[in-house]
Every structure is written in structure tokens, then in C-alpha cells.
UniProtKB/Swiss-Prot annotation:
Record lineage: Bacteria, Pseudomonadati, Pseudomonadota, Gammaproteobacteria, Pseudomonadales
UniProt organism field: Pseudomonas aeruginosa (strain ATCC 15692 / DSM 22644 / CIP 104116 / JCM 14847 / LMG 12228 / 1C / PRS 101 / PAO1)
Gene name linked to the record: gbdR
PANTHER family: ARAC-FAMILY TRANSCRIPTIONAL REGULATOR (PTHR43130), HTH-TYPE TRANSCRIPTIONAL REGULATOR RV1931C (PTHR43130:SF3)
Alphabetic keyword roster: Activator, DNA-binding, Transcription, Transcription regulation
SUPFAM superfamilies membership: Class I glutamine amidotransferase-like, Homeodomain-like
Protein name: HTH-type transcriptional regulator GbdR
SMART domains the UniProt entry points to: HTH_ARAC
Traits of the deletion mutant: Mutant is unable to grow on choline, GB and DMG as sole carbon or nitrogen sources. Mutants that lack this gene are unable to induce plcH and pchP in media containing GB or choline and in phosphatidylcholine-rich environments, such as lung surfactant or mouse lung lavage fluid.
Portion annotated as DNA-binding: 244-265, 292-315
UniProt-recorded Gene Ontology molecular function terms: DNA-binding transcription activator activity; transcription cis-regulatory region binding
Domain HTH araC/xylS-type: 227-325
InterPro entries given in the database record: Class_I_gatase-like, DJ-1/PfpI, Homeodomain-like_sf, HTH_AraC, HTH_AraC-typ_CS, INH-QAR
Pfam families with a match to the protein in the record: DJ-1_PfpI, HTH_18
Induction / repression: The highest level of transcriptional activity is reached in the presence of choline. Regulated at the transcriptional level by a sigma-54-dependent promoter. Transcription can be activated by NtrC in the absence of a preferential nitrogen source, by CbrB in the absence of a preferential carbon source, and by the integration host factor (IHF), by favouring DNA bending. Negatively regulated by BetI in the absence of choline.
Record keyword Aminoacyl-tRNA synthetase present: no
Amino acid sequence: MTTYAPGVPPQNRNPQSIGFLLLDNFTLISLASAVEPLRMANQLSGRELYRWHTLSLDGRQVWASDGLQITPDAGTDNAPAVDCVIVCGGVGIQRSVTREHVTFLQAQARQGRRLGAVCTGSWALARAGLLDGYDCSVHWECLAAMQEAFPRVAMSTRLFSIDRNRFTSSGGTAPMDMMLHLIGREHGRELSAAISEMFIYERIRNEQDHQRVPLKHMLGTNQPKLQEIVALMEANLEEPIDLDELAVYVNVSRRQLERLFQKYLHCSPSRYYLKLRLIRARQLLKQTSMSIIEVASVCGFVSTPHFSKCYREYFGIPPRDERQGQPLGQPVVLMPIPQDLALMPNSSALSALSQAQGESTFASVRI
């Protein structure tokens, strides 16, 4: 998306051309959330305000994270001229970004293109060195890994970040908020509000909104003291706060602290704190090349053997095997296929499930 010269009447502006670079296993919902506001902007204005193209390195089909295939409009070597490029990431982002992607993005930056990303696409821009010194948003599952891998990038938990000629968004439907914000900047709030109404979108969220489900919903309670304690725990994983200190911070006794966790979370505060640290460790093991010793240290464990013991007890697999791919730790359990369905084409759901096994949230909800 370009920055228009002031004073140019809207009817005299050329359509903005946007290239969506699709990485392997990109999330379809993030792509749709970015493209659909552009389509609706054209429809409601009755003019071609935006045009868009999907791109891949070689112009061949790209698999989305749900197993569906998208045939792009062009490859990067014969891509039409665009004003900006938006990288669409998804599952297994470290494996999806290649040297060729980096070279292409760096070339776009040298040519003065604006660059954006949705879901985990920020990883590609960061790997190309194109986010150094910029504010950046990325899907929360990838946040810890990016903080470790790219210390020069100002990572944020915001839904989206717009910083000079870079705009990055977290996943899910957050790209829609970012695109509506950009459309509103360029064509007025009346248009962005009308687009929002067409999509039954109750509220256009802004840059001050943060991702992750609010603690009160995650914890299943409105207990404010408990929310405050958990927020403190999440913010202090590398150097865990003593439980007595936690109680002092929120002005409760140690005994009250214990009762709150038992009543609402059905575990002790120390057990819950340990769970948070182990979940962070799993993200780093799966998404970074940090050694097990380093992971243990940044997650608040002074002893690597103790870390390995706790990890195995919680996840059922030692950290070493998790790093190697854990096919034996948490296999995908398949239901028997009925005989009358055996000859039908394979569902793309199984392929998508297989690809997702490498994600840190795989099998994280116990049912």
C-alpha cells in the first residue's frame, strides 16, 4: 500500500497493487482476512481501489495449512509490478522460509516497496533483516522464538503493528483489522466502517489491542487477583518470582494464594507456574536452535537434569526427543475408516494434522 501525495483527488489515484507471497503451509484464514477487505473496498466504492496477486517462488501450487492447494497468479521471477508485498506465513515457518524468499524480499525492499506480513510471515521479513529497528507483530505461538532469533526486532503482542513502511499482523482474523485500518487511513473511516458492516464485524480493533484470549476467559473466572498473579507469572518465566513475593505483590496471604489456585485452577500455584515455564520451553525447543541447556536457563531452570525430568513428566517425552521430532511421544491417533468410505479420496485434514505435529501447541488441549 502506497502513501499518496496530499491533494490528489481520490478519483485520480491509480489502483494500489499488492502481491501476497504464499509460503508453504500458510494459513488460509489470514490470507482471506487480508484480501477480503480489499475486495469489499472496491465493491462499496464502485471503483478499483486495489488489485492483488498471489505469488510463489516458482508459480506452482502452494499448500495451505488446512491441506487445500492454491495456484498462485505468478512466480516471483515474473511477478507483475506491485506497490507492496505481504508475506503470508503459517505452520512450520522456519522450514518454509528459504534463501530464495529472503533474496526476493531484500530486492523488493531495495526497490522501495512497502513490506507486510500476516500470521507468522514476519519471520521471513526478520530473517531477511528487513525488520531490524521496526515494531513487529507476529502470531503469539511464534513470539518467543522470534524474540530469541531476532533481538534487533521490536517484538510486540499487539494484534498488528504499522511502523513506517512496514506493517505486520498476528494471525487469525487480525489481518482484517490491519487492512481496515490501512484502508481507513487512505480512503476514510466511512469506507472502512462500511466494509466492517458487510462482514458483520462488530468492532475494528486497533494497534493498542493485544492478542491472546483475555486471562479471565482462559482461566474461566473473573477473579481479578488470580488474573494479576498469572500475568506476573507469564511476565517472569526466566527468573521465577517466589510465591511469597507473588502474594505480597497482589496483597494476599500465601494461604489465600494457594486457595485461589486450588479453587479456580485445581492445582497449586507452583504447579501452574511450572506449567507456564514448560510450555515456553516447548515453544523454544520446536521453533529455535537453542541448546537444551540454553532453553532450560531462559525458562528458569537452574539444573538441566531437573528441567528434563519435569519436561518428561509433563509432556511424556524428554526434551531431546522433542527436538528430534517426537513421532513416538504423541502419535496421531486415527479412527478406523468405515469400509464404505475406504475407497473415497483421502481427506486433506489428515495431511494438515500431520504437518501440525511439529507445532508447539500440538495436542496441548487434553480432551
